[in-house]
């Protein structure tokens, strides 16, 4: 059996930037064990599998597909950058003719629309709730040390804990944080947290005018630090909407690779997440 596979850098227009995802378009479903083995072999933060809903469907003309995401260690419920990358494979390599395609996922139907050089994802918004920092003092200490914090929020729906550093901390403080995966894992074992967001307010008056910055860590899912994380921005968009009063925001994730996301929080409680992609590898898996 041969399976086509693509490596796509998401949330960037430059190769070797953004967040790489492996994408496999499949004519039929595989065994769960095989999905996981392929994802482990690829060893990227996520490998996504696009599957035809019906055998008679066509990648060029079809408008609905199944989509699943796997880290090197487990299947996850939502992944933004691999969704963006999956849409890019359909639009650019499978020559899908539709302006919008819908992915059936564990997080419900996700629609993705091509818009010029960008792809826009329609994602659920995941509003976090304020938490007492004392409840998470160990993970806060492990993540940010003695740097002052302003807010601690938790998205129970995504199990993402968000720490906002005080406004006295600038981008250089955020990028200089040395977050150790082993220490994070040992500091949080309750199961309430499977991802950690650290964020600071941006500098919208300075070009290109980022409204906020962030980093994201998920060693609980086998990902020490994720380069650019669409799903984390379903939490961040809700939080910063409340703090900034802006529905349209420009965000930057400050990993070593870095990536830019355009956000629009809609009145219906969902968020549009837009970004670009670059395909850097196309090949075949032989099984």
Q: At which residue positions do the language-model features occur?
A:
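Active-site proximal loop and beta-alpha junction motif in alpha/beta enzyme cores
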Residues: 1-78, 84-287
């Amino acid at each position: 059996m041969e399976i086509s596979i693509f490596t796509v850098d998401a949330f960037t227009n430059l190769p070797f930037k953004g967040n790489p995802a492996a994408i496999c378009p499949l004519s039929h479903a595989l065994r769960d064990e095989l999905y996981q083995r392929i994802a482990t072999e690829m060893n990227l933060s996520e490998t996504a599998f696009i599957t035809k809903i019906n055998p008679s469907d066509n990648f060029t003309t079809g408008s609905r597909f199944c989509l699943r995401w796997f880290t090197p260690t487990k299947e996850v419920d939502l992944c933004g950058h691999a969704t963006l990358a999956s849409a890019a494979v359909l639009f650019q390599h499978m020559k899908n003719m539709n302006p919008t395609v819908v992915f059936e996922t564990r997080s419900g139907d996700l629609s993705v629309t091509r818009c010029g050089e960008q792809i826009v994802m329609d994602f659920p918004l995941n509003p976090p709730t304020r938490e007492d920092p004392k409840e998470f003092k160990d993970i806060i200490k492990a993540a940010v040390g003695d740097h002052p914090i302003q807010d601690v929020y938790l998205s129970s729906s995504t199990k993402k804990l968000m720490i906002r550093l005080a406004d006295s901390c600038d981008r250089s403080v955020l990028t200089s944080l040395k977050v150790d995966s082993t220490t994070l894992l040992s500091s949080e074992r309750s199961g309430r947290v499977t991802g950690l967001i650290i964020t600071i307010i941006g500098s919208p008056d300075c070009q290109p005018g980022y409204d906020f910055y962030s980093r994201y860590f998920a060693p609980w899912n086998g990902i020490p630090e994720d380069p650019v994380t669409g799903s984390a921005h379903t939490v961040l968009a809700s939080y910063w909407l409340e703090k900034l009063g802006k529905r349209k925001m420009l965000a930057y994730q400050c990993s070593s690779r870095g990536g830019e996301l355009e956000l629009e929080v809609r009145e219906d409680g969902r968020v549009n997440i837009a970004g670009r992609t670059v395909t850097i590898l196309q090949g075949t898996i032989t099984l």
